[in-house]
From Swiss-Prot:
GO terms for biological process: nucleobase-containing small molecule interconversion; pyrimidine nucleotide metabolic process. It catalyses: CMP + ATP = CDP + ADP; dCMP + ATP = dCDP + ADP. One of its GO terms (cellular component) is cytosol. ATP binds at G12, P13, S14, G15, A16, G17, K18, G19, T20. Keywords: ATP-binding, Cytoplasm, Kinase, Nucleotide-binding, Transferase. It is found in: Cytoplasm. One of its GO terms (molecular function) is ATP binding. This is Cytidylate kinase. Belongs to the cytidylate kinase family. Type 1 subfamily. The gene is cmk.
């Protein structure tokens, strides 16, 4: 009998710190890593590259079904490869982020990408980063964590990130964009952004990233020991 690889799902809104937490957990446990948000960003970028309308579900489904994407972990960094090209930086632009949130609202697009996401489940285990990992993609995951933070704190973190990269940003505008995206993600008809019933809800608003990692790893190790 083939062993089923365990999965730790990390869900939550944009800017809560999921990416940093997932990389740290994957390194600590030596597990595979899936950035599901990157898959939607890659699809959005592929649509922009191929001049496919991101507002058209009919046009997006074939593209999603044949999306050539893979993840390569190098020296602790996750490289996102689209059609043989490293697009790790390109998918992180605000234009692609907004388009990704839009394409994620279509039920048939999400269905087309489900199989690709589930294919990342391999031994010794998988850390899955997203918005519906614990509720839709891996509902049988033995460990589920919902990482949250206030919209103000997430806007502040994003502002610091952008400033470090040399960008001039307006906090109020950034906060408005985050609130708008939260509203869209939490109220969409398919796979809305909500914690799984059996998830640990971890609020990172007043915690350092080291504290978040410590709490998440402690919880995961306890749950996996019982599984």
């Amino acid at each position: 009998m083939t062993a089923i690889a365990p999965v730790i799902t990390i869900d939550g809104p944009s800017g809560a710190g999921k990416g940093t937490l997932c990389k740290a957990m994957a390194e600590a446990l030596q597990w595979h890593l899936l950035d599901s948000g990157a898959i939607y960003r890659v699809l959005a970028l592929a649509a922009l590259h191929h001049h496919v309308d991101v507002a058209s579900e009919d046009a997006l489904v074939p593209l999603a079904s044949h999306l050539d994407v893979r993840f390569v972990s190098t020296n602790g960094n996750l490289e996102v490869i689209l059609e043989g090209e490293d697009v790790s930086g390109e998918i992180r632009t605000q234009e692609v982020a907004n388009a990704a949130s839009q394409v994620a609202t279509f039920p048939r697009v999400r269905e087309a990408l489900l199989r690709r996401q589930r294919a990342f489940r391999e031994l010794p285990g998988l850390i899955a980063d997203g918005r519906d990992m614990g509720t839709v993609v891996f509902p049988d995951a033995p460990v589920k964590i919902f990482l949250d933070a206030s919209s103000e704190e997430r806007a502040h973190r994003r502002m610091l990130q952008l400033q470090e990269k040399g960008f001039s940003v307006n906090f109020e505008r950034l906060l408005a964009e985050i609130k708008e995206r939260d509203d869209r993600d939490r109220n969409r008809a398919v796979a809305p952004l909500v914690p799984a019933a059996d998830a640990l809800v971890l609020d990172s608003t007043t915690l350092s990233i080291e504290q978040v990692i410590e709490k998440a790893l402690q919880y995961a190790r306890q749950k996996l020991a019982l599984a």
